[in-house]
Swiss-Prot record:
This is Bifunctional autolysin. In the N-terminal section; belongs to the N-acetylmuramoyl-L-alanine amidase 2 family. In the C-terminal section; belongs to the glycosyl hydrolase 73 family. It is found in: Secreted. It comes from Staphylococcus aureus (strain Mu3 / ATCC 700698). Pfam families: Amidase_2, Glucosaminidase, GW. Residues 110-141, 193-218 are annotated as: Disordered. It is an enzyme of class 3 (hydrolase). Oligomer; forms a ring structure at the cell surface which is important for efficient partitioning of daughter cells after cell division. It catalyses: Hydrolyzes the link between N-acetylmuramoyl residues and L-amino acid residues in certain cell-wall glycopeptides; an N(4)-(oligosaccharide-(1->3)-[oligosaccharide-(1->6)]-beta-D-Man-(1->4)-beta-D-GlcNAc-(1->4)-alpha-D-GlcNAc)-L-asparaginyl-[protein] + H2O = an oligosaccharide-(1->3)-[oligosaccharide-(1->6)]-beta-D-Man-(1->4)-D-GlcNAc + N(4)-(N-acetyl-beta-D-glucosaminyl)-L-asparaginyl-[protein]. GO terms for molecular function: amidase activity; mannosyl-glycoprotein endo-beta-N-acetylglucosaminidase activity; N-acetylmuramoyl-L-alanine amidase activity. Keywords: Cell wall biogenesis/degradation, Hydrolase, Multifunctional enzyme, Repeat, Secreted, Signal. It comes from the Bacteria. One of its GO terms (biological process) is cell wall organization.
Amino acid sequence: MLGVINRMAKKFNYKLPSMVALTLVGSAVTAHQVQAAETTQDQTTNKNVLDSNKVKATTEQAKAEVKNPTQNISGTQVYQDPAIVQPKTANNKTGNAQVSQKVDTAQVNGDTRANQSATTNNTQPVAKSTSTTAPKTNTNVTNAGYSLVDDEDDNSEHQINPELIKSAAKPAALETQYKAAAPKAKTEATPKVTTFSASAQPRSVAATPKTSLPKYKPQVNSSINDYIRKNNLKAPKIEEDYTSYFPKYAYRNGVGRPEGIVVHDTANDRSTINGEISYMKNNYQNAFVHAFVDGDRIIETAPTDYLSWGVGAVGNPRFINVEIVHTHDYASFARSMNNYADYAATQLQYYGLKPDSAEYDGNGTVWTHYAVSKYLGGTDHADPHGYLRSHNYSYDQLYDLINEKYLIKMGKVAPWGTQFTTTPTTPSKPTTPSKPSTGKLTVAANNGVAQIKPTNSGLYTTVYDKTGKATNEVQKTFAVSKTATLGNQKFYLVQDYNSGNKFGWVKEGDVVYNTAKSPVNVNQSYSIKSGTKLYTVPWGTSKQVAGSVSGSGNQTFKASKQQQIDKSIYLYGSVNGKSGWVSKAYLVDTAKPTPTPIPKPSTPTTNNKLTVSSLNGVAQINAKNNGLFTTVYDKTGKPTKEVQKTFAVTKEASLGGNKFYLVKDYNSPTLIGWVKQGDVIYNNAKSPVNVMQTYTVKPGTKLYSVPWGTYKQEAGAVSGTGNQTFKATKQQQIDKSIYLFGTVNGKSGWVSKAYLAVPAAPKKAVAQPKTAVKAYTVTKPQTTQTVSKIAQVKPNNTGIRASVYEKTAKNGAKYADRTFYVTKERAHGNETYVLLNNTSHNIPLGWFNVKDLNVQNLGKEVKTTQKYTVNKSNNGLSMVPWGTKNQVILTGNNIAQGTFNATKQVSVGKDVYLYGTINNRTGWVNAKDLTAPTAVKPTTSAAKDYNYTYVIKNGNGYYYVTPNSDTAKYSLKAFNEQPFAVVKEQVINGQTWYYGKLSNGKLAWIKSTDLAKELIKYNQTGMTLNQVAQIQAGLQYKPQVQRVPGKWTDANFNDVKHAMDTKRLAQDPALKYQFLRLDQPQNISIDKINQFLKGKGVLENQGAAFNKAAQMYGINEVYLISHALLETGNGTSQLAKGADVVNNKVVTNSNTKYHNVFGIAAYDNDPLREGIKYAKQAGWDTVSKAIVGGAKFIGNSYVKAGQNTLYKMRWNPAHPGTHQYATDVDWANINAKIIKGYYDKIGEVGKYFDIPQYK
């Protein structure tokens, strides 16, 4: 059970994951139950640990309710949440609501919009809306958006001297007269409700809608804001692009309680919104934000109820972070500002916050990254001011637009395109909105079904409606997703069972309701009488009949899904080509003996084992075949005309002695059906890859709609005379042949590479380029030019700028005596500037004056495969070609006379640099420091047995059918960084070859130079060891140390620094295992695991299960084994040996036992009963199922959350002081020694290490 090991109190409410219990022995460790909720830390800047799972689920559900994207509902009846009220609005004498002060007064003609009025509510969040005009009925939309720059990376374009932003006095005008007052609380029981809906009007060219609201008076002059208003720009629907593995931590005030929003820009002129998001997802451990915005889209990338890592340790627990993606023309920039303002106003409105600029006093709800740097610290970035100024725009203008958007959404000023009343008119007879039902409103999730009675009160759009609307949807079964109680009335929200389309709210007394459990997948055959009715839904009515069972006598019903409604079981399946639901009472299990013999043999396949697996291949159906099968259980297939065509194969299935392929249309998701293996010509296929290559092709060559296409799939023929240009954009390997997709003369299609002429490859040589590279000369282009150069920053320089327009540069000392890539060049005035890029991440750093640099031309990288000897006198291995002494990875002495394996080369000015590997490190060496080997006499040694598991380190290498052969070699790209289990070794011509098994089970030969005994990756943290140690030592709850056994005291700075010193730890053979990647299986042989598990109780001989679990869920095998051994007392605990829970009591002698080997859900109050209950619910009736199922839980819960080493769990170097799993400074050391001990006993070593590096 979780937590049976050392319940000591050194965690201070940090959550310790269940899987970390593997090493929870020794000092200061606590294993809380896996499903226990995390509590918020009381650590000032670290109050960001995820709230309880129930709170999280409730919050996600509530958020989803207000973010449900809907279609345009103008003039359409739609479902609304119970919180939405539709007030009446009066039509008064009107004037033009176009902004008049500092804004053009031209009338803007647009679509007729709904009138709007609103009341505010401080007791519940306001539903998000993205409409900048009067919001339409049910403007529940999704959120999105962010741009990617690592806040913790010092090498960023954002890092600009804060002094470059003038701290002008805060304009009093920004404290607008429209500033939303705090909502007034009512004394009555009915909660106040904010509404964004109004009577929807159909779109037409009718008169402009009228409103009694005042017009907005801009507080700053802005031609761009005027352009936005005059053109009545609309914000796009917010898209959601969430990533499951992003961590979810609460803000310092709790889940769903941000304090404001921060304006960022991406600092990358070349990026796109998709590129930024893609990069962020791959590097989220360093930084991720909530949303990205450009001129066309708003994409929310992380739920705004939880914090993100975008603005430093102080700001992250407080603010929503949103990035502006760079645009390059006036209209696009204006749209992006409109989109950002609308998104920001939506967030403020949703979370009950009012716009309040923090730019000039460090207090408020709207911040720039610069303001966070200036007033809060934890970051030194100054965006977005430089980017905004480059478009003649300012933060004050953006804030004014946010404020206006907010006031429009809150119903305090007139929307754009409407008319306003010059003086409010008092109606002769007061008209007040319908008063909603009184009483407290409660809404809860529900998972049931209901049938609406013939006599009913109708469907309600909201539970506040006085009357429902008549409906014909009676005596049908619907799904129920919510219940709501308002006063004494109870309602159900009903929706279509199959599509999820919501119909509306119905009163409890108007339905027949039943509870329902969630459907589960099954694979079972039953016997069913002909004539039995099938239904479109479980518990269906006569209005939901899907059909009747045809035939005579009993038929076979193949069930694929099951659901319990109240106490009845319903199954979904197929019979004679018809599908539907039927009560289990009408089915007979075919496994049971029949009372009389059946003259015809029963379906033989139902008693055979079915195995199904994914497949990536292609197939052509033979002209003679057995037809297409709807399921592999079918006795006969249906005739098909889809013969002699190429289809994609997505699955293969084996049933009894038959093997089937599932074929689908190659270009669409349309499934064709199952075909027998003997009825097709099958070929393996690799996944298509994007390419950008030009070939020549002869006229008349056929193009096909699919790769390996047949005459029935011709897309056309190449026209013209003589060779034509074929521009390829995609490539796929089918068996051993390559096919390319491209365009020629306006026609597109696939063609075999054999019909294409490949451009000559560049020569691979270390010799100096044939043509001398011209010396770099300064040019002064009028616009920004893309260049390929490389530069060294001089020790004495004038500094770095965010843009060429910055008058004052930030100190550039940190970049001095270092080499960087140059990607852009621009003249400004009489000076020329170039944009330097980070060498490892290709992230722009900033602009330098060329006078501060030594610049050379940079050639194109060329692949090469050559082995060299490093000269005794050399300049070392560098991180970058033409690198300086500050960028040396290995000094000259460390690589002298060593073997350097080159993989690519590039020219820098007149020199050539090669990139390759030496001493297990990769980097650049000047060609002058290398000597090519002399030819050796061919020699071949006999192959000998050799058992060792290596790691494939060169994805550009190959594996071979026979060693030293170029005729049968295949790319290692798909196996890069995967284990390779070697069984033989052979030396041929001085090259060592290893024969072994790839991760997919295939046997192959690989060169020793493409393998490594271990794969170590070094990650730069961007901080010094002193800085991170100071953060840890300064936490409110101090790191702990035992100077006297059993007595805990606060650790001092030196204790922490010593414990965090990665250089020292990496040199220790045992402590190095702090850096072992726990999310990377090593393919340790099952035999070795079983040898180790001998005598370990029920875990004995479970090597196959641990191996399967590791491969399926990407978890280190030793880590899993260690965890299981500690949790089960070496496999002897009753929880591991198994039991059953009957009538809520544990029964250990039952026929069926359920096992729990990781202690999941084994809560302290009754660990055995709770743990067995969980195992029973999960179906773990064997030890192997408990191992595999438990591994899934562990992997999904913690290891994949980013902190995938013991060191990261303890110290979290990406965000020091936050989300750490222990307080004992020796915690990672103790656990690393334990894991190393297990490796030694198994007879293996760790293969994958991830080591943080400090400056």
